[in-house]
């Protein structure tokens, strides 16, 4: 009887989680309960909890496991054995089924897409590997191969033959170890470096500086044997078979791989953005791995060439000490040159003969779609797919996901955290925003108006601040931006994109409307449709407290400033985000001198003078630095930070704005109608420009 009840309970759990009906309510385990699944394919994941009866058929083979008990099965129309869908393992457990939307692509198509990404990544890496960006590291790669004969040739004829053979093998493998270390660090740092630094609250260039220090140390060890012994001393207590020292080349490759990251082309720039926003999936990993492999093959060719020359030319074999000193000197010179960004001048002097090839293979629709994965689907957020963007009626999209990984709170008593479960009984609006985002600045007056109008009627608002730029991670900057926008409701600081990812968000702004039972009922991405959102808020408030007296809708008094015509897309100056650069030459990280092109395409920008570019924005590095912008809009805003002045030239008339303090938004054009125009912005030296936005 107990077992029968447990079976029935399991069937009910499946039904409630997957939205399907049990075919029977009570059966013994000898005749397991079944569940009817609607026609069409879906997916269910089984997660387990302790305390239920064993399944006598748990040893059935040909099962796929995931999660903790974790049977993972595709379901199609028909009846399915509950116990076989979620087999028990070794302990007594009960299972619950969580519905997960199926990938609509056929299996063959999914495999084809991954193979396409692999091919595109490999070709993109190969093109990068033969581009001018490899020139700064070529001497070190070449000499690392030439030095590989050291261990084999210096070994004395007397002594154990096995030792000489081991040294010869190590010498032969040295070029492969150098390139292997480069591929590993190149891929890992590019994919995970930004996220790791954000988690550790370290500067975004911390890994690069660590690699420069390591490069200098390796070079000094090659020149001074006593210093090399000091470097290896901390590893002396480790069993020799486990030591991976500088001499085998792997450490040198690790350092070079970090410093090789700025050479990445458009594909790796997209991967950097994916890594920073925690959208790392199979496609991103495959693209990164194949890109790193493709980029490393030309370098391996040069390393092996150095090795072959050293083996065949007697002078190399007789002067191994001099070769070590030369290798160390070149390594240190490379590190010093990278500190002062000298290789950038060499890269600018030589035309990038591979730029057009990289653009051709990186602009495909498939790649863009697969890198923009829409967040990681998990048991908490799977049912968000049931909501359509901006629907005019309430929908049911599952229990609201948790506010994960929040690094701090503002506008709460003592800045203490808020748990969504504590707000049950209230209608909750989750608003994703960033204080320098002009789209958010246009939307937030409506959110503030709703909060002021309905907070006494049962509405709670939480603003989840997910930074678009590094400076937006500073709590003081967020607090100042919130005060300027009149925000008094609680703010959750989502600096690590954890909540952003858990809600599968991709937009600034975005609203998630949650009813009094904790269920997501409406999702709106972007600006506009404020009257629809407010109508649904009022409907949920009435559902939570029938007969509640509500004030007049605030949308009648707050103007809707959402642009209705097609405007120039938001213009980013960060190396990893730039999409509409219309100037000549490469737009790469580092300091460079630019000039305007003879003509500037619509909805694009160009630079003039000396600029220092990074993944956040562009910093004026000279007194002649300027930006020319061809835009289509009524209003133009610029996000800029630092101390100095910003001169805006429009229709030949200059206007100067004083700039002081952390980066924030400044309006540079306030037009009276939508128009296509060109303007020039001249920031004083030291100002950092992040983006243009339009209204």
From Swiss-Prot:
Coiled coil: none annotated. The keyword Transcription regulation does not apply. Keywords: Cell membrane, Membrane, Transmembrane, Transmembrane helix. Its main location: membrane. GO terms for cellular component: plasma membrane. Residues 394-542 form the Thioredoxin domain. PANTHER family: PROTEIN DIPZ (PTHR42852:SF13), THIOL:DISULFIDE INTERCHANGE PROTEIN DSBE (PTHR42852). This is Protein DipZ. It comes from Mycobacterium bovis (strain ATCC BAA-935 / AF2122/97).
């Amino acid at each position: 009887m107990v077992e029968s009840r447990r079976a029935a309970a399991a069937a009910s759990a499946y039904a409630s989680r997957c939205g399907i009906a049990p075919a029977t309510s009570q059966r013994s385990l000898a005749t397991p309960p079944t569940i009817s699944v609607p026609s069409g394919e879906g997916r269910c994941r089984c997660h387990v909890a302790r305390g239920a009866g064993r399944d006598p058929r748990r040893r059935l083979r040909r099962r796929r496991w995931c999660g903790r008990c974790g049977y993972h099965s595709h379901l199609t129309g028909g009846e399915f054995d509950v116990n076989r869908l979620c087999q028990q393992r070794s302990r007594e457990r009960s299972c619950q089924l969580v519905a997960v939307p199926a990938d609509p692509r056929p299996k063959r198509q999914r495999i084809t897409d991954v193979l396409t990404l692999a091919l595109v990544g490999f070709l993109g890496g190969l093109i990068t590997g033969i581009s001018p960006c490899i020139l700064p590291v070529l001497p070190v790669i070449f000499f690392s191969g030439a030095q590989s004969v050291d261990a084999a040739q210096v070994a004395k004829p007397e002594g154990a033959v096995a030792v000489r053979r081991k040294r010869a093998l190590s010498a032969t493998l040295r070029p492969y170890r150098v390139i292997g270390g480069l591929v590993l660090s190149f891929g890992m740092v590019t994919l995970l470096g930004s996220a790791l630094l954000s988690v550790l609250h370290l500067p975004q260039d911390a890994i690069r500086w660590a690699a420069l220090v390591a490069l200098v140390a390796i070079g000094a060890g090659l020149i001074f044997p006593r210093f090399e012994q000091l470097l290896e001393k901390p590893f002396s207590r480790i069993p020799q078979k486990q030591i991976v020292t500088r001499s085998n080349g792997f450490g040198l490759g690790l350092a070079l791989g970090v410093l090789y990251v700025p050479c990445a082309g458009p594909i790796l720039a997209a991967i950097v953005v994916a890594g920073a926003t925690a959208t790392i999936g199979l496609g991103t990993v495959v693209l990164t791995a194949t890109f790193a492999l493709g980029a490393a093959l030309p370098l391996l060719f040069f390393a092996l060439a150095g090795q072959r020359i050293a083996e065949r030319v007697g002078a190399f074999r007789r002067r191994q000490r001099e070769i070590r000193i030369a290798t160390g000197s070149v390594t240190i010179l490379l590190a010093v040159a990278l500190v002062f960004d000298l290789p950038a001048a060499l890269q600018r002097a030589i035309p990038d003969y591979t730029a057009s090839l990289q653009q051709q293979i990186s602009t495909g629709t498939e790649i863009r779609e697969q890198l923009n994965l829409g967040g990681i689907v998990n048991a908490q957020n799977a049912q968000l797919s049931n909501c359509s963007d901006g629907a005019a009626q309430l929908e049911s999209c599952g229990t609201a996901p948790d506010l994960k990984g929040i690094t701090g709170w503002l506008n709460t008593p003592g800045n203490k955290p808020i748990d969504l479960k504590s707000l049950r009984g209230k209608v909750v609006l989750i608003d994703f925003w960033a204080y320098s985002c002009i789209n958010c600045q246009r939307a937030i007056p409506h959110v503030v108006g709703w909060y002021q109008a309905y907070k006494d009627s049962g509405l709670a608002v939480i603003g989840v601040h997910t930074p678009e730029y590094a400076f937006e991670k500073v709590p003081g900057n967020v607090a100042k931006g919130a005060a300027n926008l009149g925000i008094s409701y609680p703010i959750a600081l989502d600096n690590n994109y954890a909540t952003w990812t858990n809600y599968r968000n991709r937009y600034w702004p975005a609203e998630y409307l949650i009813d009094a039972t904790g269920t997501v009922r409406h999702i709106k991405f972007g600006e506009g449709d404020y009257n629809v959102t407010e109508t649904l808020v009022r409907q949920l408030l009435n559902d939570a407290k029938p007969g509640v007296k509500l004030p007049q809708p605030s949308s009648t008094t707050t103007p809707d400033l959402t642009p209705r015509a097609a405007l120039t897309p938001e213009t980013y100056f960060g190396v990893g985000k730039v999409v509409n650069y219309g100037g000549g030459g490469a737009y790469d990280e580092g300091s460079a001198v630019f000039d305007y092109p003879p003509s500037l395409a619509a909805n694009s920008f160009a630079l003039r003078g000396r600029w220092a570019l990074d993944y956040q924005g562009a910093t004026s590095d000279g007194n002649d630095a300027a930006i020319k912008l061809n835009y289509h809009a009524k209003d133009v805003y610029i996000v800029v930070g630092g101390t100095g002045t910003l001169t805006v030239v429009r229709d030949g008339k200059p206007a100067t704005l004083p700039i002081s303090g952390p980066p924030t938004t400044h309006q540079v054009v306030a037009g009276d109608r939508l128009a296509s125009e060109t303007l020039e912005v001249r920031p004083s030296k030291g100002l950092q420009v992040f983006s243009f936005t339009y209204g």
